[in-house]
Amino acid sequence: MPEMPEVETVRRTLTPLVKGKTIAKINIWYPKIIVNDPAEFVKKLTNKRILKIDRYGKYLLFRFNDDLTMVSHLRMEGKYHLVSPDTPKGKHEHVEFIFTDGTALRYDDVRKFGRMHLVETGTERKTTGIRHLGPEPNTAEFNLKYFVDALSQKKKNIKNTLLDQTIVCGLGNIYVDEVLWKSKIHPLSSAKAIPADKVKNLYQNINHTIAIATKERGTTVHTYLDANGEIGGYQKMLQVYGHAGEECSSCGTILEKIKVNGRGTTFCPHCQVLYK
């Protein structure tokens, strides 16, 4: 699933391709992608102009005139790309926005898990999925005091805690494994048992890792591509994710992989301390 750095990269690369364009027609080939009534969705967006694209957590927010916002969640495999309207439809293309300038934006999703929800601008934070999201890394809301207080109330393990989007949004399996390794914390550690100095280090590593991953245009380990069809660069910097069975770059111990709440989790059994 695209995490915050990937979704932000999609936003940055997609914006110059579609900003200012007006929708002339919409083709919906797989209606379940649309949360609204598909006919109403088409009616409201036809002749509307894209003003800009914002993002919150893993959600893209397409801003239109007349106070409309399309909330788009890419889920596991969703991708946007600009094409000519006469380009043959791809097998996994499910929604097409044809613009008045003769170009078209298509949404491609192998698993069909992505969703688009048209709402009134200003109400998007009340929509399902977004309304319970916690703060993003590298924001004023995500400060050290907030993070310390949040962890002190959690009995569950730190891996599941960091994946909880109500605590901090935008982190997924890849970056959680990476920040826990950098912080030398075992993924099964009790969140509330981690020492204060280690929590501070973890907080700093979350912010730094997300910032660097975003600068590197995200991580491509499976199918992730930006709006220009280009891969990310952070996969070259991964230390544990995808490296189970290899030597830890810090101590040489063989990295292990376990399941944590059904999620594959790679860690160093020597470097990463288990706090109970």
UniProtKB/Swiss-Prot annotation:
What residue range is the signal peptide? none
Query: What species is given as this protein's source?
Result: Lactobacillus gasseri (strain ATCC 33323 / DSM 20243 / BCRC 14619 / CIP 102991 / JCM 1131 / KCTC 3163 / NCIMB 11718 / NCTC 13722 / AM63)
Q: Name the needed cofactors.
A: Zn(2+)
| Binding residues annotated for DNA, in chain numbering | 92, 111, 154
| Stored Pfam families | Fapy_DNA_glyco (PF01149), H2TH (PF06831), zf-FPG_IleRS (PF06827)
This protein's record includes keyword Magnesium: no
Tell me the protein's name: Formamidopyrimidine-DNA glycosylase
**Catalyzed reaction equations:** Hydrolysis of DNA containing ring-opened 7-methylguanine residues, releasing 2,6-diamino-4-hydroxy-5-(N-methyl)formamidopyrimidine; 2'-deoxyribonucleotide-(2'-deoxyribose 5'-phosphate)-2'-deoxyribonucleotide-DNA = a 3'-end 2'-deoxyribonucleotide-(2,3-dehydro-2,3-deoxyribose 5'-phosphate)-DNA + a 5'-end 5'-phospho-2'-deoxyribonucleoside-DNA + H(+)
Textual note on the cofactor? Binds 1 zinc ion per subunit.
| EC number annotated for this UniProt entry | 3.2.2.23, 4.2.99.18
Q: Which PANTHER family match?
A: FORMAMIDOPYRIMIDINE-DNA GLYCOSYLASE (PTHR22993:SF9)
Q: What does the subunit comment say?
A: Monomer.
Per its database record, what is this protein's job? Involved in base excision repair of DNA damaged by oxidation or by mutagenic agents. Acts as a DNA glycosylase that recognizes and removes damaged bases. Has a preference for oxidized purines, such as 7,8-dihydro-8-oxoguanine (8-oxoG). Has AP (apurinic/apyrimidinic) lyase activity and introduces nicks in the DNA strand. Cleaves the DNA backbone by beta-delta elimination to generate a single-strand break at the site of the removed base with both 3'- and 5'-phosphates.
